[in-house]
Amino acid sequence: MSESENKIRVLVVDDDVDQLMLLERTLNAYGFEVRTHRSSLGVSNLVRNAIPDLVLLDVNIPALSGDKVLALARNQAPATTRFILYSASDESKLRSLALSSGADGYISKSVQGEALARKLISIYKKSKLPAASAR
């Protein structure tokens, strides 16, 4: 198995270019394989073609909000792909939105570096559980 086959594949969707660059550098440094996308449009196709393990979705993105993108993209994604809402907004609001939209997790944008990597790995490992215990 090659090194890239062992990496957790993450698709990061955010309209903030600086945020995308920061996340890409950070997650690459922690051994993730990262792909970025600057728009809520086209995410379903990316998910279908790139088959990421995790999709980190900015909630406040123009055109379609993160929870709406999640609803559309989940239909194109393999059952093992996990969707995580990502936002700088109040954590209780983010938690509520994640629960109501069926996200597999949520992460505040204040979580960075090693803490972010640990949270993503934790959500990824939960995706390995049988579907019946995932909810």
Where do the model's predicted regions map?
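Non-catalytic signal-transmission and effector/linker regions of two-component phosphorelay proteins
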Residues: M1-L11, E114-R135
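Two-component/phosphorelay signaling modules centered on CheY-like receiver
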Residues: V17-R35
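The feature encodes the CheY-like receiver
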Residues: L20, P62, E91
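Acidic, metal-coordinating helix/loop segments flanking the phosphotransfer/catalytic sites
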Residues: T36-L54
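Acidic catalytic/metal-coordinating carboxylates
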Residues: R38-S39, S65-K68
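Alpha4 helix (beta4-alpha4-beta5 surface) of REC/receiver domains from two-component response regulators
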Residues: K68, D90-I107, V111, A115-R118
